[in-house]
From Swiss-Prot:
Annotated catalytic residues: H260 (proton acceptor)
Pathway the protein contributes to: Amino-acid biosynthesis; glycine biosynthesis
Family named by the database record: Belongs to the FMN-dependent alpha-hydroxy acid dehydrogenase family.
Modified residues (N6-succinyllysine): K184
Protein name: 2-Hydroxyacid oxidase 1
Motif annotated as Microbody targeting signal, chain positions: 368-370
Species the sequence originates in: Mus musculus (Mouse)
Tissues in which the UniProt entry reports expression: Liver.
């Protein structure tokens, strides 16, 4: 009999004993001492909720829009690579769950299911494409054009990975893809991170990034991407107000406040702590989103109160996927949705439009660990 899992931490605790160690470590771990990994979650507790009373909350509307597309709730699925390591159906199970739940999924360029396969599995799902800028720009261009053709609604370009962060668990485990898997958006063994490729004796993914991803990425590449596609462009990985302003100048449609799940530069702030700076910097000109550390419905409420249009979740989706495939992903999303609904009701919020910064204040006694 399967255990009864009722919150996100239950899922992570359970799948730790289910997944192969190197796979679990890959999904779970952060960079270096993992200070930011812990802080991403702990930071939410530094922001306290100040609920409104005597509001009619008999009916709660969670729906909102992301880049002009309607979603049932401001909880979306972030780009998590190589999901077939967690479950045989991988990204196909995830997109089907998103389709059922009426929310959006960002597909990783490094998926173990192709752009086309995911579109076929979730034809009615709201899908976005995550993009890395490769040394060979033609590779990135083809990913964008394939995503356009298959009905993906936006491009989320990752800008925080000129090199891969020092993920010590991956180095210890000499992380590589299992022999039966490959990144299915690429043809050659080297680009597909195939076990047949040569990726050294340490973290194979770090070697892959060093070989393939362009460390000379600059704002000129955002201009190039803007000329390449008419799809909305979201810059993923911004943590400073001046970078946010520069992104707006370069014509992006959104900013995803992200520290890559604490997997790149350890010691950066938790995303919830820098969110207000980014929201202030863009002056309402583009939509702002957040990922990193979202584990509860109250986390979602706090992020929206501080100005995020929606949040993206990554690891919780993997834990649900590893537990029970499509159903596990759907159950995780249902848990977050119902927790968020309750948090809204107990805060006096009938819909997401009335969620504002008066609902949260930073605890003056709380001191960040970063």
């Amino acid at each position: 009999m399967l255990p009864r899992l009722v919150c996100i931490s239950d899922y992570e605790q359970h799948v730790r004993s289910v997944l192969q160690k190197s796979v679990y470590d890959y999904y779970r771990s952060g960079a270096n001492d993992q200070e930011t990994l812990a802080d991403n979650i702990q930071a939410f507790s530094r922001w306290k909720l100040y609920p409104r009373m005597l509001r009619n909350v008999a009916d709660i509307d969670l729906s909102t829009s992301v880049l002009g597309q309607r979603v049932s709730m401001p909880i979306c699925v972030g780009a998590t690579a190589m999901q077939c390591m967690a479950h045989v159906d991988g990204e196909l199970a995830t997109v089907r769950a998103c389709q059922t739940m009426g929310t959006g999924m960002m597909l990783s360029s490094w998926a173990t299911s192709s752009i086309e396969e995911v579109a076929e599995a979730g034809p009615e799902a709201l899908r976005w494409m995550q993009l890395y800028i490769y040394k060979d720009r033609e590779i990135s261009r083809q990913i964008v054009k394939r995503a356009e053709k298959q009905g993906y609604k936006a491009i989320f370009v990752t800008v925080d990975t000129p090199y891969l962060g020092n993920r010590i668990d991956d180095v210890r485990n000499r992380f590589k893809l299992p022999p039966q898997l490959r990144m299915k958006n690429f043809e050659t063994n080297d680009l597909a991170f195939s076990p047949k490729g040569n990726f050294g004796d340490n973290s194979g993914l770090a070697e892959y990034v060093a070989q393939a991803i362009d460390p000379s990425l600059s704002w000129d590449d955002i201009t190039w991407l803007r000329r390449l596609t008419s799809l909305p462009i979201v810059v993923k990985g911004i943590l400073r107000g001046d970078d946010a302003k520069e992104a707006v100048k370069h014509g992006v449609d959104g900013i995803l406040v992200s520290n890559h799940g604490a997997r790149q530069l350890d010691g950066v702030p938790a995303t919830i702590d820098v969110l207000p700076e980014i929201v202030e910097a863009v002056e309402g000109k583009v939509e702002v989103f957040l990922d990193g550390g979202v584990r509860k419905g109250t986390d979602v409420l706090k992020a929206l109160a501080l100005g995020a249009k929606a949040v993206f979740v990554g690891r919780p989706i993997i834990w649900g996927l590893a537990f029970q495939g499509e159903k596990g992903v759907q159950d995780v999303l249902e848990i977050l949705k119902e927790e968020f609904r309750l948090a809204m009701a107990l805060s006096g919020c009938q819909n997401v439009k009335v969620i504002d910064k008066t609902l949260v204040r930073k605890n003056p006694l709380a001191v960040s660990k970063i």
